[in-house]
Amino acid sequence: MRNKLIELVEASQLRTDFPEFRVGDNVRVHVRIREGGKERIQIFEGLVISKKESGTRETFTVRKISFGIGVNRTFPLHSPLISAIEVVRSNKVRRAKLYYMKNRAGKSARLKEIKR
């Protein structure tokens, strides 16, 4: 059983300004990057292959292919560094984790799109 004070503090940290997305969705994540004294927004677009944890510790992993090399990036969902998340496309999947997509390329890596 969790402490009520901890739950109260965590509830104030949760962000609700993001759209609902699932594993299998293609998303575009806008991340704030600080380089030197400047800050800019970098967009990372790819397939959500996993979602883990709950509450303030919730994370999701996005995979994309960049110049022929697969890149996985894990984001904390409630991080202040994430400025926006856009759902580009929703796909039909039957698994909670899509780690098998790491071994697929070309036509075998296709997923069936669903309308939401």
Swiss-Prot record:
The record's keywords, sorted A to Z, are: Ribonucleoprotein, Ribosomal protein
What's one GO-annotated cellular component?
cytosolic large ribosomal subunit
> Which molecular-function annotations from GO does this UniProt entry contain?
structural constituent of ribosome
* Cross-referenced PROSITE patterns: RIBOSOMAL_L19 (PS01015)
Instruction: Name any Gene Ontology BP term.
Output: translation
What the entry lists under InterPro entries is as follows:
Ribosomal_bL19 (IPR001857), Ribosomal_bL19_CS (IPR018257), Ribosomal_bL19_sf (IPR038657), Translation_prot_SH3-like_sf (IPR008991)
Write down the HAMAP family for this protein, in alphabetical order: Ribosomal_bL19 (MF_00402)
The family annotation for this protein states:
Belongs to the bacterial ribosomal protein bL19 family.
The entry's function note states: This protein is located at the 30S-50S ribosomal subunit interface and may play a role in the structure and function of the aminoacyl-tRNA binding site.
What protein name does the entry list? Large ribosomal subunit protein bL19
Q: Which organism is it from?
A: Mycoplasmopsis agalactiae (strain NCTC 10123 / CIP 59.7 / PG2) (Mycoplasma agalactiae)
